[in-house]
Amino acid sequence: MSFDLKLSGGDLVIQGGKLQTVTDGEKLLQDILKMCLTTAGTNPVHPWYGSFLSRTIIGNSLNASVLVQIGKSQLNTCLENLKKLQDLQVKSLQKVSADEQISAISDISIIRNEINPTLYDIRISVLTKGFKTINASFRLSAL
C-alpha cells in the first residue's frame, strides 16, 4: 500500500510531533484534488501533471454552458492521466491498494453559483477498484 503526506488547507498535517499520512480512499481523494487543482504546465519536471481548468474558467467570457463542457472535458482528461499514473505504479510493482486506484469516473459536475456567478462548484465522483465511491468537491473562482 502506498501513502502520501496528509495535507489540510495546503499545509502538512503534524500531530503529536509526527507528519500524518493518508492511505487508501483518503489518499485517492487527496490525489484527485491535487491533480485537478494543479495547473497543468506548472511542474517543470512533469508539465503534463494537472489540469487546465483554472486557465479555462478564470477570466474567460465564453458562455457559462460552454465553459462547463470544456471544464468537464479537461477534468476527465486529468483524471484519466491520474489513472495512467496509478497503472504505472502497479506495473513498477509498487504496492497500491484497490481503494487508491480509480476504476471508473462516475460523474463530473460543474455548477455556476447562482448567488455569485464568479464561483463554480465542482464535484467529482469516482469508483475505486475496491468498489468504493470517492467524492471530491471544491470551489473555483473565476476571478
Language-model regions: role of each:
Residues 1-69, 100-143:
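Immediate N-terminus of the mature polypeptide
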Residues 66-103:
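Mid-chain, well-packed structural core segment of small domains
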